[in-house]
Amino acid sequence: MSEWISVKDRLPKLNQEILGYEKDIVYWGFYSQFGFLDTLEECERKETTHWMFIPNPPKEVV
């Protein structure tokens, strides 16, 4: 399982899809040359404090 990574410790690769955390908001987005971008809201997230890799989908449930 993915763990939250502080932006002070490490940043994602450019254009890498991530889950981001900002002020009690978890968002799906990516990291670009402009910073963190929210894919669904189509906006910049300037106060992102943590991020994580997109988790793998669940295994097939029987």
Regions found by a protein language model. Give the residues of each.
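Secondary-structure transition motif
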Residues: M1-V62
